[in-house]
Amino acid sequence: MDSLNYTTACDSAVETENQSDNSSSGSSLFKTQCVPVPPKRRQRNTIRKFVHIPKNTQATESSSDSSIEPRPLTLKAIFERFKNKKRKRKKKKYKPTGRSVGRPKGRRTTRYSQITEKQFKDKRPGFPFLESENGRKPLPWRKILTFEQAVARGFFNYLEKLKYEYYLKESLKQMNVAEDLEKDDLDSRRYRYLDDDGSLSPIEESAAEEETAANLEHDECDIKLVENSYFIISSEFPKKKQNVHLDQEEYTEETALLKKRTSKSKHWIEDKMA
């Protein structure tokens, strides 16, 4: 209600100023001076008091009745107001750059081709213990990779060992067993079992089993001690297969010669008989 009264008072003040200007100018049809319109103050926190009404409805309501009270605020009206206030983002138009689309022509460049020999020599990892094998030649990439992986593996294994030793010391201190740290090495302590000092669950042997074991000792056995010479294999080894094949080849050659001779002799006899 206060805002409506303020707007009506501003409109009446503007009309009185216009009338005074017209009377001073006389019967002139044109206005020589523009009346400065006072700037309207922004209404803050109007959402809580009034419902936002679009321009078309405002014109109809102001023409019909100015004494109508505003409607109560609802959630639907709030959402509609914020939807109308959302600014539409401008769509970015495609600007052609002139570059070719897709993969560029030519051979694909690799990182190895970009590295120079000087950079490779400066940054190459050194393994001096391999000079006896390769000499002063540079190592291939595969060997460098395998040795680097081995170095990293050894480093992480050493870290694991240090971590184990640290936690072992702390646990022994909590158990008040600090003397064992001085006597035993940590590597030997690592593979130590719980039943070193004594069995966890001792098993008692029965009397029947003890009697059977004593009887077996007194009984005679058929086992005899034998010298080692009985277990030595004879020195006669079979001939190799290659020799067998050679003998077969020689035999086939001899048979072929005999067959040729017999065939020739048969032909010679037949010619004479004819």
Curated annotation (Swiss-Prot):
Taxonomically, which superkingdom?
Answer: Eukaryota
Per UniProt, subcellular location reads as:
Nucleus
Which Pfam families does the protein's record reference?
A: TAF1D
Composition bias, kind Basic residues: at what positions? 84-110
Biased region (Polar residues) positions are: 1-19
GO cellular component assignments: centriolar satellite; cytosol; mitotic spindle; nucleoplasm; RNA polymerase transcription factor SL1 complex
Tell me the first and last residues of the signal peptide.
none
Q: Which UniProt keywords apply?
A: DNA-binding, Nucleus, Phosphoprotein, Transcription, Transcription regulation
Residues recorded with modification Phosphoserine: S20, S132, S229
Instruction: Give this protein's Gene Ontology molecular function annotations.
Output: DNA binding; identical protein binding
According to the record, the residues making up region (Disordered) are 1-45, 84-111
* InterPro entries in UniProt: TAF1D
One biological process term in Gene Ontology: regulation of DNA-templated transcription
What does the protein in this record do? Component of the transcription factor SL1/TIF-IB complex, which is involved in the assembly of the PIC (preinitiation complex) during RNA polymerase I-dependent transcription. The rate of PIC formation probably is primarily dependent on the rate of association of SL1/TIF-IB with the rDNA promoter. SL1/TIF-IB is involved in stabilization of nucleolar transcription factor 1/UBTF on rDNA. Formation of SL1/TIF-IB excludes the association of TBP with TFIID subunits.
Q: Subunit notes for this chain?
A: Component of the transcription factor SL1/TIF-IB complex, composed of TBP and at least TAF1A, TAF1B, TAF1C and TAF1D. Interacts with UBTF.
Q: What is this protein called?
A: TATA box-binding protein-associated factor RNA polymerase I subunit D
Please give the organism.
Answer: Bos taurus
Organism classification: Eukaryota, Metazoa, Chordata, Craniata, Vertebrata
